[in-house]
């Protein structure tokens, strides 16, 4: 896939000036139309050229209406993020329907970790499967994903870094990480190809952008976003599905798992007290052990017996230390919550 972005695509100054004004207007108009749509737009910018990716993020913030765009740059995970599920910071950055999120960074860091031996092949495969699952959830919920991978050949990157080092005007853009990344670029290539293949899904393919020429790069990125968004906005809203009332007619006898629950089960009070005390003591010690090991536990309670759920929760929390748990009641989604995935 990367070879397709090494053919020498360029855009002259005159060509650039001819297409940019209309392209910018089209991008902003598409953003305005998106405001009334029932889906969000997520633009993912990744690549093996950090400087190019940074420039593209800045360019999109210049060309698009930032009132309806939120940019999230994912650097090294903070201590708080390391204590959370692996994609927690992505969950927090999801846009509501009708808005756009620009995500940058994070993906190539995982590739570098594989190349440097910090992450095993098995761990990388697990990470990919979780990322595929998240992508599938977003697509099934209607999100439009535009995924851009910026590629600059190692030879061109090396020449650019050398020029920047000599020139005071551009030298500040370069840091030691860029030189270190350049040394592992060839080793990273098969890992990148694997990531791009695994994460290319129907409706959400990767667009590999040749980033050597900045004019070609910026126009290609903006045009890809514009074309994907306008095409999606032009689609007819899905027609409602007619469902026969017979589907909801009560059957003579519906056997489910709940039909087999023994509602007459009970304990004598003395036996209940003894067993409850023993189990609460065991739960208390397990919770302390989990705290020391950094193990997180989520308990989900569902059912039509609200008093029963509340009673169970109270008896569990009685055995825990107050700082170790949080009870979160979940009601029907609010209108604001319904705007998000």
Region annotations inferred by a language model:
Residues 1-341:
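Glycine-rich phosphate-binding loop of ATP-dependent small-molecule kinases
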